UniProtKB/Swiss-Prot annotation:
PANTHER family: 30S/40S RIBOSOMAL PROTEIN S3, SMALL RIBOSOMAL SUBUNIT PROTEIN US3C. Residues 38-106 form the KH type-2 domain. It comes from Phocaeicola vulgatus (strain ATCC 8482 / DSM 1447 / JCM 5826 / CCUG 4940 / NBRC 14291 / NCTC 11154) (Bacteroides vulgatus). Keywords: Ribonucleoprotein, Ribosomal protein, RNA-binding, rRNA-binding. Belongs to the universal ribosomal protein uS3 family. This is Small ribosomal subunit protein uS3. GO terms for biological process: translation. Pfam families: KH_2 (PF07650), Ribosomal_S3_C (PF00189). The lineage of its organism: Bacteria, Pseudomonadati, Bacteroidota, Bacteroidia, Bacteroidales. One of its GO terms (cellular component) is cytosolic small ribosomal subunit. Residues 217-243 are annotated as: Disordered. Part of the 30S ribosomal subunit. Forms a tight complex with proteins S10 and S14. Binds the lower part of the 30S subunit head. Binds mRNA in the 70S ribosome, positioning it for translation. GO terms for molecular function: mRNA binding; rRNA binding; structural constituent of ribosome.
Length: 243
């Protein structure tokens, strides 16, 4: 079963927290739709900022949005002007007050979302898919990952019949729930059609639940109006295999 299901959803409540944290009651459907609109808008608006994860928390009158990105300077802007502009734009989606926290991804090579999107953009830029994948695998393993697996599907090299190719290095134990497996599915639009790219990255083993991975650090500028606390690296240990 671990080979079929999304490894992130398979670890929810074990070593991974939810991306939406709130109680909706009778307004659950409206809040869920609002979260979807916020994420869709932010992913389109911040396409060049290498956004990895968007976590939304809600209270009665406040919506707290945590954006994990590899390029926080693009989102924050000079003196925080871009953050203020972003808040005003998001108020058109929700009628509640907005608080935005920016977390920087310290090692983007270990983030499956960023790796998958980088491969997709390179393939769209007419770089050979084998070269893009092998470079991504080499960079990820060099940064300390225990393993990585990349699956690409579609009309590769313009072939008449679609096929799939898998490239992997190291270990990615999908059935081990304490294994910190990051996963993403991205798409690359080429002249011959759409290519699907899936990436699994094993970052070690985790003992104890945490909400945000230690791969994130909060930027100083993002604490404007917020509490500025980051408990992401609390109450867990990482185990490395000695091989």
């Amino acid at each position: 079963m671990g080979q079929k299901v999304n490894p992130i959803s398979n670890r929810l409540g074990i070593i991974r927290g939810w991306d939406s944290n709130w109680y909706g009651g009778n307004d659950y459907g409206d809040a869920l739709l609002e979260d979807s609109k916020i994420r869709k808008y932010l992913n389109a608006r911040l396409a060049k900022a290498s956004v990895s994860r968007i976590v939304i928390e809600r209270t009665l009158k406040l919506v707290t949005i945590t954006v994990c990105t590899a390029r926080p300077g693009i989102i924050i802007g000079k003196g925080g002007q871009e953050v203020d502009k972003l808040k005003e734009e998001l108020k058109k989606i929700t009628d509640k007050d907005i608080q935005i926290n920016i977390f920087e991804v310290k090692r983007p090579e270990l983030d499956a979302v960023i790796v998958a999107n980088n491969i997709a953009r390179q393939v769209e830029g007419k770089i050979a898919y084998r070269r893009a994948i092998k470079m991504a695998i080499a960079n990820t393993m060099r940064m300390g990952a225990e393993g990585i697996k990349v699956l690409i599907s579609g009309r590769l090299n313009g072939a008449e019949m679609a096929r799939s190719e898998m490239y992997k290095e190291g270990r990615t134990p999908l059935h081990t729930f304490r294994a910190d497996i990051d996963y993403c599915h991205a798409e690359a639009l080429t002249k011959v059609g759409l290519l699907g790219i899936k990436v699994w990255i094993c970052r070690g083993e985790v003992y104890g639940k945490r909400e945000l991975a230690p791969n994130f650090t909060q930027t100083k500028e993002s604490g404007r109006g917020g509490n500025g606390n980051n408990n992401g690296g609390k109450n867990f240990k990482r185990k490395k295999n000695n091989r």
